[in-house]
Each structure stands twice: as C-alpha cells, then as structure tokens.
C-alpha cells in the first residue's frame, strides 16, 4: 500500500470511504469506514478497482467538483482517469481515459496533485528525464497534456502551495527542495531557489496548517 486517501464527500455517496493504491497487486482497494461516533472504528473491504498487470497504481488525486479520480501508475507511467458514480450510495469507478503520463517510459512515476483552481493536474517522474508533467483538466474531467518541465534528480514528492502560485519539489537524490513559480498557463517555471537538506534525502513534503 503506497497511499491511503479518504474519498471526498459527494451528494450521491453515503458514508465514509477510503481508497488505498496497492501497487504490488495492481489494484486500488476500496474500504468502507465507520467512525467511532457511528459505532466504529470499523474498516470493511468493499471491493477493488483492477488495473492492468504490471502497471503498479501508486498515488491518487480527486476532483470533487467534477466527480473524478486520477490514479498515477508507477511502473507503466500511465495516468488513469475515473468518473466517480453511485450505485445505491456505494461509490463506483468508471474508467474514462488512460494516457501516458510522461513521454519517457521511465518506470518511476511518483506523485500527483491537482492545482487549487482545478484547471491543471501535475505528476512527477523519476529514473530517467526526471521532471513534472503538466496536464490541462477539461470541463468533463478528462485531461489534455500541456508540457513537461525538468527538475533535480529523483522528484519523489511535491506539493502545490495553497495559493496556487508555487510548486515545491522534493528531489531525493539531489538532497534538496526546488521551488517553481506557476505561470498563467499552469507551467512550472524554475525560480532558482533551492533549499539543500544535505545529508538528508527528502522523500515527502507537506504543509501543516
């Protein structure tokens, strides 16, 4: 299991649900969660979202406004786009699009985040031609690739600042965090600001409110 995410609250979905990408089994686990206030905590495995053999689903992101889920596969470098639907209050996931997240078949796709505006989707890629892939989110929730920006070595994790103006990239092998400005077209532009963390190697980055 590489990540655990709560499904955002949606009008047609009843209760609380957890999704967990299981890279080794090529599935995303769907788990029903009952909170302590409701008689829990109880976790019940409800089902799985299957992926192609060897794809390796790693991280997911949600667009609650459009009712979409995006899943980045580490091994195949593909981005799977799902529509989230309801079957009697239970979430169902309908595959809408599959695209190659980068152009390099590097086998090291890592992190994924949606811009606060909902207009752009970003993914990071390692092992060859390391960088960030940028996609435009269409009105129907599908994506259209916009470009690719190189980063320092091994961008394992990144975040978008809450104001949507900057991207901070944690480059594990470079032992640094690199700062990018996001221009009007959603493209990351290097600022030249790099925070060295040597001898530590950053593997995750987050802002705590």
Explain the meaning of each model-derived region.
Residues 72-84, 88-122:
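Oxyanion-binding "anion nests"
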Residues 40-49, 91-100, 144-150, 189-197:
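Beta-propeller fold detector
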Residues 20-23, 63, 71-75, 123-127, ...:
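Conserved beta-strand positions in repeat-built beta-propeller and related beta-rich domains
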Residues 1-15, 50-68, 100-118, 149-166, ...:
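Beta-rich, blade/repeat-based domains predominating
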């Amino acid at each position: 299991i590489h990540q655990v995410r709560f499904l955002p609250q949606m009008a047609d979905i009843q209760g609380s649900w957890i999704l967990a990408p299981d890279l080794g089994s090529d599935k995303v686990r769907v788990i029903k969660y009952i909170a302590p206030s409701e008689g829990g905590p109880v976790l019940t495995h409800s089902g799985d979202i299957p992926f192609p053999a060897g794809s390796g689903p790693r991280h997911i992101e949600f667009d609650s406004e459009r009712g979409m889920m995006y899943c980045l596969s580490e091994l195949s470098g593909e981005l799977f786009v799902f529509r989230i639907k309801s079957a009697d209050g239970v979430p169902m996931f309908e595959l809408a699009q599959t695209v190659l997240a980068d152009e390099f078949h590097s086998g090291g796709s890592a992190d994924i985040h949606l811009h606060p505006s909902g207009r752009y989707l970003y993914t990071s890629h390692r092992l060859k031609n390391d960088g960030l892939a940028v996609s435009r989110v269409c009105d129907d929730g599908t994506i259209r690739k916009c470009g690719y920006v190189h980063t320092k070595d091994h961008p394992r994790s990144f975040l978008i600042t809450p104001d949507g103006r900057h991207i901070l990239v944690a480059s594990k092998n470079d032992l640094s965090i690199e700062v990018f400005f996001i221009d009007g077209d959603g493209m990351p532009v290097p600022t030249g600001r790099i925070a060295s963390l040597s001898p530590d190697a950053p593997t995750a980055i987050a802002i705590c409110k």
